[in-house]
Amino acid sequence: MNKMNRLSHNTEIRNAIYSGVGIGISGNSFLLLFHIFKYIRGQRSRHIDLPIGLLSLIHLVMLIAMSLVATDIFMPWGRWGDTTCKCVISLYRFCRSLSLCATSLLSILQAVTLNPRNSCLEKFKRKSPHYMLGCLLFLSVFYTFISSPLATYITAKSNLTSPSFTYITTSCSLAPMSYSFHLTVFILLTSRDVIFVGLMLLSSGYMVTFLGRHKKQSQFLHITSFSLKPSAEKRAMRTILCLMSFFVLMYTLDSIVSYIRSIDDGQIFYCVHIFTAHGYATVSPFLILSTEKYIINIFRSTFGRMVTIILLRNR
C-alpha cells in the first residue's frame, strides 16, 4: 500500500482536519451572516465591512472546497473523474489566491480610512470599497488566465500511467510539467505573493506608525476631545497586528512546508501542509469577531442572563 494511501486510516489526523475545517466554516458563516444582518437592519456600515464580508465569503467557499478534498483523502466514496478533480482543486486554489488579494486590499483600505478627513485621500476613501470590488474582479480574471493552463495538469488517477505524478488526493494527481512551464508559473505566482504581502506589510506598518503618532500627539496636547479615542485606537491596532501578523505567519509556514514537500513529499509534511494551507481561513473570522463591540455585548448580555437564570433556579 502506498504511504499516502495510509492517510485514509489515520483517524486522529482525519478528525483534526475535519474539526479545523468545521470550526472555520462555522466562524466564517457567522461573520458573513453578521454583516448581512447589519445591512438588512440598515445599520451604519464602515468602510471595511464590505471587504470583511467578501473575505469571509471567500474563506467559506475555500473551506467547503477543502472539506471535499479532505473527504477524498480520508473517506473516498468513489473515484473522481477528470472534470471533478479539475473543478474542486482549481476552486480551492482560486479561493486561496483571492484570500491573499482580499487580505492585502483590506489592509490598504484600513490604512486609507485612518487618514484625516481633509486629506487628499478623502475622495478615494468614500469609494474605496467599490474600488476593492473592481480590483478583486480584475485579479480574479487575471488569476483565472494564469491558472487555466495549470488546471490541465490536474488529472484523475485512473488515467495515470507514470509514477512521476504528484499525489493530491486519493482520486487526483498532478501530471509532470515541462521545466519552462513550471518556471513560468513559479515566477508569476511568486511575483504575485511578493507584491501583495509587501503591500500588506507596508500598509500595516503605516497604520501602526500613524496610530502611535496620533496617540502621542493627543497625550502631549491633553485635549479632552481625544479622551475616548485611545481605546478605539488600541483596538484597531490590535486587530490589524493580529490579523496581518497571523496571515504572514501562516503564509511563511505554508511556504516553508511547500518547499520541504518539493524535496520530501511524505505523509507527515503533506498533513502539515493541509493545516497551514487553511489555518488563516479558519482563525481569521474569530480574530475579527473578537473586536466587534456589537457581538461582544450580545454575548455578555446572553451570558449574564444565563447566569441569572441558573442562580434563580438554584435558590
UniProtKB/Swiss-Prot annotation:
Q: Which residues lie on this side of the membrane: Extracellular?
A: 1-15, 72-90, 155-193, 261-267
Q: Which PANTHER family does the entry link to? A: VOMERONASAL TYPE-1 RECEPTOR (PTHR24062)
Q: What happens when the gene is disrupted?
A: Mice lacking all but one V1ra and V1rb gene (12% of the V1r repertoire) show a lack of chemosensory response to a subset of known pheromonal ligands and changes in maternal aggression as well as male reproductive behavior.
Q: How does it sit in the membrane?
A: Multi-pass membrane protein
GO (cellular component) term, any one: plasma membrane
Transmembrane segments in this chain: where? 16-40, 52-71, 91-112, 133-154, 194-212, 240-260, 268-288
Identify the domain of life: Eukaryota
Which Pfam families does the record cross-reference, listed alphabetically? V1R
Q: What's this protein's function?
A: Putative pheromone receptor implicated in the regulation of social and reproductive behavior.
The GO terms describing molecular function are: pheromone receptor activity
The protein's location, in the record's own words, is: Cell membrane
**Stretches assigned to the Cytoplasmic side:** 41-51, 113-132, 213-239, 289-315
Keyword annotations for this protein?
Cell membrane, Disulfide bond, G-protein coupled receptor, Membrane, Pheromone response, Receptor, Transducer, Transmembrane, Transmembrane helix
Q: Which family does it belong to?
A: Belongs to the G-protein coupled receptor 1 family.
What's the protein called, per UniProt?
Vomeronasal type-1 receptor 54
InterPro entries assigned to the protein according to its UniProt record, in alphabetical order: GPCR_Rhodpsn_7TM, Vmron_rcpt_1
GO terms for biological process, alphabetical: response to pheromone; sensory perception of chemical stimulus
- In its UniProt entry, the species of origin is given as Mus musculus
Taken from the UniProt record, the cysteine pairs bridged by disulfide bonds within this chain are C85-C172
For this protein's source organism, the top of the classification is: Eukaryota, Metazoa, Chordata, Craniata, Vertebrata
